[in-house]
Amino acid sequence: KMCGVTQNWESYESTKKASQLNLTPEQQRFPQRYIKLGIFVDHGMYTKYSGNSERITKRVHQMINNINMMCRALNIVTTLSLLEIWSEKDLITVQASAPTTLTLFGAWRETVLLNRTSHDHAQLLTATIFNGNVIGRAPVGGMCDPKRSVAIVRDHNAIVFVVAVTMTHEMGHNLGNHHDEDKCNCNTCIMSKVLSRQPSKYFSECSKDYYQTFLTNHNFQCILNAPLRTDTVSTPVSGNELLEAGEDCDCGSPANPCCDAATCKLRPGAQCGEGLCCDQCRFTSAGTECRAARSECDIAESCAGQSADCPTDDFHRNGQPCLNNHGYCYNGNCPIMFYQCIALFGSNATVGQDGCFDANDIGHKYFHCRKDNEKYIPCAPQDVKCGRLFCTYIYDIDLCRYDDSANGMVAQGTKCADGKVCNSNRQCADVNTAY
């Protein structure tokens, strides 16, 4: 059984509070992110479980708990914000062709679903047996995109954990991860191309590096902020590091001095149980920095003194010059090709010569600006620096190195000319109208 993704595979430091002391070094490596999941159960899966919606709901809740456990190594909290069971009929045509079904599901999310509910990433669970022994598929790097922040997963095993690994795998693709190669020294990890008989609950070091590159090149707003308690629909689970409906605090251990583990209610005299602005069960004083600025495009946030939560992550306006006019601010980062080359090829890399980028007007699998209905659209001459990124090393004979994965494209918001940046359509557009 395998994943259907077929591409070639190639911080900020927050103030540490009592509630964060249990973070592993891996979690401290990545900034906190939150993914609100929408799960859709197709009619075939509804029929598979004899129309027992309660059984399906319980199974999905268990899947979400497993996904959340696996994503902790990336410092990601996942919550179930929407569960929809297609009990009467499918709302899209679910086919044996995984690519076709994924395309239809993405289009439905963009045109129908987002008009009626808010979430970050949607997955379709199905009983359909896909061609080629495929059990899941998702676009690489599609997180937060209206059409591409989706995945399809076959409910292929009676064991909840095994299916949850596949769901995490596909969400990993959306977060910029590719399949683990032999050099990753982990043929059973979450991003392995083929699901093993005993899949691991761990991400490989390769996956962590890919995710770190993804965060370096992108700063998608949809996963920056914690959901409200009213945004979650799963049964409250104590110790999942998130406040859900019915909880005053997320206690976890009975030894928590702020929170009663039996009731998930605050102990007498406690103002809070966790949060960046909670210290020893009390609100941190107003003005205490709770989230440092991670770049000159970001804004540091401070506690208000009346809440345990750090204010919403904010940043300077998009288009503000940064890094000595080498770039323009975009969603709190200053994306420039130089740092993207370093992220892809190491500290000795630099941007390739201008002539390298002319290859992007070919309309090839690797050299293009956009993809439309499986057709690669060449870049217009003025847009070639918004397609594939070209890098080189100092004194390197290869002046036009490139990474043929999704991460090898020039990041949105990157400066492509004076007063211009790459927009979401991979056009080199005026910085005043590009966002």
UniProtKB/Swiss-Prot annotation:
Q: Which cofactor does it need?
A: Zn(2+)
Organism superkingdom: Eukaryota
Propeptide section residues: 1-26, 228-243
> Which sites carry carbohydrate?
N115
- CDD domains for this protein: ZnMc_adamalysin_II_like
A GO term, aspect molecular function = toxin activity
Which EC numbers does the record give? 3.4.24.-
Q: Which GO terms describe its cellular component?
A: extracellular region; plasma membrane
* Primary residence: secreted
Alphabetically list the UniProt keywords: Apoptosis, Calcium, Cell adhesion impairing toxin, Disulfide bond, Glycoprotein, Hemostasis impairing toxin, Hydrolase, Metal-binding, Metalloprotease, Platelet aggregation inhibiting toxin, Protease, Pyrrolidone carboxylic acid, Secreted, Toxin, Zinc, Zymogen
Q: How is the cofactor bound?
A: Binds 1 zinc ion per subunit.
Q: What class of enzyme is it?
A: hydrolase
Question: Where do the catalytic residues lie?
Answer: E170
- Domain (Disintegrin) spans 235-318
Q: Would the keyword Calcium be found if you checked this record's keyword annotation?
A: yes
Sequence positions bearing Pyrrolidone carboxylic acid: Q27
| Maturation and modification | The N-terminus of the metalloproteinase is blocked.
Q: Where does Zn(2+) bind?
A: H169, H173, H179
Summarize where Ca(2+) binds, as residue positions: V237, N240, L242, E244, E247, D250
Q: Which family does it belong to?
A: Belongs to the venom metalloproteinase (M12B) family. P-III subfamily. P-IIIb sub-subfamily.
Q: How does it assemble?
A: Monomer.
Name of this protein: Zinc metalloproteinase/disintegrin
Q: What is the lineage of its organism?
A: Eukaryota, Metazoa, Chordata, Craniata, Vertebrata
